[in-house]
Amino acid sequence: MPLDYHALKSRPIAELEHRYDARDTILYALGVGLGADPLDAGQLRYLLERDLVALPTFATVLAYPFMWFDDPRWGVDGARLLHAGHALRMHAPLPARGAVFGRTRAVVVSDKGAARGALIVLERTLSDGPGGAPIATQTMTLMARGDGGFSAREGNGPPGGDAFAAPRAAPPEGPPDAVVELATLPQAALIYRLVADPNPLHADPAFARAAGFDRPILHGLCAYGMAGHAILRAYLGMDAARLRAISLRFAAPVFPGDALRFELWRTGDAVRLRATVPARAGLLVLDAGEAELG
């Protein structure tokens, strides 16, 4: 069954409440690399129940309908779906424990052709309850590699689907003014999936091979959370309340065990960033990064 344009666009993909406790908040922080120095007070504020603080990027895993693409109504080939980019804007601090309400909907479904696949942009809003005060808004850009050509089917959306032009940030100029190096554990994806995305692409070697990878890859949002950690460390004294927004493009897969080198440029409250893997010939894995500080 081909991707169903009207099914995706006509209704929310999910509306759900997500209850979480201190253990979930701490497990997420461990999953994105905090705790490497267990004596660092800046890291411990996200790892100890007393006066616990939630990382802003924890919002990326809350009230999200993981494995939504398994629902046959959408006609999406989940095995060939890749996360291409993510943007998060915080409207209020995320509670360290409690409940949030999330609404996820497809705002763009674009047909790039049978050979190139389709592009899907999901928007998710988080609030403190249905119709409540907003906490965060985020967009997730997905490449549906197996779903191109859907608009050739009569009545399945406008020709080419929705128009979409990805925003392109100009590359930073000059050397970075801050560099943060963060390692990932070989078991990083296995830890992260306990509180986040259970997609077998990140845990099952056979599934990863079927998707075209030699082995399971690290979740894009795990690397994204590490980028947030790098910003907090470089500029904000590990103060989560001052990270207002962050967006990134996933340029290449990160593998568990990779060490990431984050390069950052700051102008006022605006930050540009990218990440490479030095041990893989300096491969660029996170690109076009932008953040807003408060």
Regions found by a protein language model. Give the residues of each.
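A contiguous, surface-exposed recognition patch within enzymatic or periplasmic domains that forms
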Residues: 2-47, 158-223, 230-233
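Residue-level preference for alpha-helix termini and adjacent loops
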Residues: 7, 12, 19, 43-47, ...
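Hydrophobic, proline/glycine-rich low-complexity stretches
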Residues: 1-101
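HotDog/MaoC-like acyl-thioester-processing domains
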Residues: 1-14, 64, 83-179, 254-257, ...
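Phosphate-binding glycine-rich loops and adjacent basic patches that engage nucleotide phosphates
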Residues: 21, 60-68, 145-147, 152-153, ...
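Catalytic-pocket segment enriched in acidic/His residues
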Residues: 202, 206-283, 290
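Residue-level recognition of well-ordered secondary-structure positions
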Residues: 29, 33, 59-60, 105, ...
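General secondary-structure edge motif
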Residues: 8-9, 68, 74, 127, ...
